[in-house]
Amino acid sequence: FYLCCLFAVSCTCGNESVYQQHLIRIDEALEHADEYVNMKQQKISTIENMLNSRGVTPLQQYHIYRQLFIEYQPFQFDKAKETLERQLVIAKQIASDSLQHCTMLDMAMLHTTAGFYLEADEIFAQIDTASLTLDQKVYWYDARQKFLHDYQEYVTTSSIEVPDASQITRYQDRILEITSDDMPLN
């Protein structure tokens, strides 16, 4: 709701008819909000039912929880965090460092996006960047620069030592250094 209001206020600087069109679209979206929530909950229920299927391996469970995380992430922080915690337990059970790293990166990004910067910083500190795959390094640099940007942007009191803005640029440059134009990233 707050974002809608902010958007509406920012639109007042431009054309009045464009502003009215945006307000109409926002009103229409709000009218259908319950439908959107119901559709999201149905999709989540379908994915959750896959967890109860016979013969689901731990690796399959990990990937099902990944699907749940993707659905919950923009929808419910607590549920998204819970699915990541379950993924991490499974990744540890099957002794997959790679899956553990992926999950930890998702946790750091989730906490950053939600504004839990202290928690995100602690999670980043737990990740052994030397053992990340190339795709994971790209994700780490991207997540870390987003963390630094958001932290500098939204936090007025500094309880985390944040490097200057040039560190964000260094992370972006590092992504360009370790990737090539013809290399697909997952």
Which ranges hold each PLM region?
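Bacterial N-terminal signal peptides
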Residues: F1-S10
